[in-house]
Amino acid sequence: MTEKEVVESPQPPFPGETPQSGLQRLKQLFKKGSPETAEMEPPPEPQANGEAVGAGGGPIYYIYEEEEEEEEEEEPPPEPPKLVNDKPHKFKDHFFKKPKFCDVCARMIVLNNKFGLRCKNCKTNIHEHCQSYVEMQRCFGKIPPGFRRAYSSPLYSDQQYAVSAANRNDPVFETLRVGVIMANKERKKGQADKKNPLAAMMEEEPESARPEEGKSQDGNNAEKDKKAEKKTPDDKNKQPGFQQSHYFVALYRFKALEKDDLDFPPGEKITVIDDSNEEWWRGKIGEKVGFFPPNFIIRVRAGERVHRVTRSFVGNREIGQITLKKDQIVVQKGDEAGGYVKVYTGRKVGLFPTDFLEEI
């Protein structure tokens, strides 16, 4: 114990406050801390100004903390992969002489002086403004020559056939192609087995003539020499088919695709042996015998002449003229009149100038 230690009376926390009132205030604070008293106490009544007054007489302020919600930024969607066309069309500017329909919009290509686009491989025709619709469309390549047998075209080559076969991947197309080839072979075999009366007569004539000539010329060498001298080269080269009232001449070039097909150039004379089938006839040129499509030839009757066009000519339909191209084969149907003659091409008949015709 020191001298400074003196028992001091507790001083009130606020000036002018008695010790008794300070004790009461402490009691009230302890009462607030106990849970039982907290449940029993009524809530503070709000005053007119909206403030709540506590038990101690002072206002109670409520502080609200606003929680700001952070918006998560959405990630941008990934860019779709760019599609790449491995076999696009090869379009080129093309002038359509005849009206064609667009393969995209199915409308006729008539605007801009009939200019449009045509694929180099598959021959697809479209408008220029329709090109964007076929950018991702695959080009199926060149059409195989096996389905173009009704046309005279230089596409009949092994090299182009191999290219078209390499571009072809459709199994349905392969099945149909094989079926068509097998059907043609079976049909041709059946036709070869049937005997044609015309061919039988042609084969029997030389056989029946040989024994008669042998009997009459036995031991007569002098007479044989005389008969040989009397025979002219024209009589030897005569063919049985040309002794009839008509014969056939090739209009177009036909190149054989199979072994039993008959190959011939335009203007060649052909002897028809079997015409029972509408799609394939059997004919003979010299010693060659084979099948060919009938729309490649034309019938020439007695008194008619065959000509070759030496120069292209555009005729006037109003006066009955016909338009023909160079090297085309035609048949004359009448006499010359005014420098023009009536000709027939198998499909069209009209007047053509005689100066542009060469007889074959």
Swiss-Prot record:
Disruption outcome: Complete perinatal lethality, due to paralysis and inability to breathe. Embryos have a curved body with abnormal curvature of the vertebral spine and drooping forelimbs. They display multiple skeletal abnormalities involving ribs, sternum and costal cartilage, and strongly reduced formation of bone ridges at major muscle attachment sites. They weigh about 15% less than wild-type at 18.5 dpc. They do not move or respond to touch, but have a beating heart when dissected out of the uterus.
GO MF entries: identical protein binding; zinc ion binding
InterPro entries, per database record: C1-like_sf, PE/DAG-bd, SH3-like_dom_sf, SH3_domain, STAC1/2/3, Stac3_SH3_1
Broad class of where this protein is predominantly found: cytoplasm
Outcome, altering residue 104 to L: Loss of co-localization with CACNA1S and strongly decreased co-localization with CACNA1C
Key words, A-Z: Cell membrane, Cytoplasm, Membrane, Metal-binding, Repeat, SH3 domain, Zinc, Zinc-finger
Effect of residue 280 to S: Loss of normal excitation-contraction coupling. Loss of function in enhancing calcium channel activity
Compositional bias of kind Basic and acidic residues: 207-238
Zinc finger Phorbol-ester/DAG-type: from-to: 88-139
Leader sequence residues: none
Pfam families, A to Z: C1_1, SH3_1, SH3_2, STAC2_u1
Residue stretches of biased makeup (Acidic residues): 64-77
Region (Disordered): 1-86, 187-241
Any one annotated GO CC term: synapse
The keyword Electron transport is annotated on this UniProt entry: no
Membrane topology type: Peripheral membrane protein
Effect upon mutating residue 133 to E: Loss of co-localization with CACNA1S and strongly decreased co-localization with CACNA1C
GO biological process, one term: skeletal muscle contraction
Gene3D superfamilies: 3.30.60.20, SH3 Domains
Domain (SH3): residue spans on this chain: 243-302, 303-360
Subcellular location: Cytoplasm; Cell membrane, Sarcolemma; Cell membrane, Sarcolemma, T-tubule
Subunit annotation: Interacts (via SH3 domains) with the calcium channels CACNA1S and CACNA1C. Component of a calcium channel complex with CACNA1S and CACNB1. Component of a calcium channel complex with CACNA1C and CACNB1.
Function: Required for normal excitation-contraction coupling in skeletal muscle and for normal muscle contraction in response to membrane depolarization. Required for normal Ca(2+) release from the sarcplasmic reticulum, which ultimately leads to muscle contraction. Probably functions via its effects on muscle calcium channels. Increases CACNA1S channel activity, in addition to its role in enhancing the expression of CACNA1S at the cell membrane. Has a redundant role in promoting the expression of the calcium channel CACNA1S at the cell membrane.
PANTHER family: SH3 AND CYSTEINE-RICH DOMAIN-CONTAINING PROTEIN 3 (PTHR15135:SF2), STAC (PTHR15135)
Annotated protein name in UniProt: SH3 and cysteine-rich domain-containing protein 3
Organism: Mus musculus (Mouse)
Gene from which this protein is expressed: Stac3
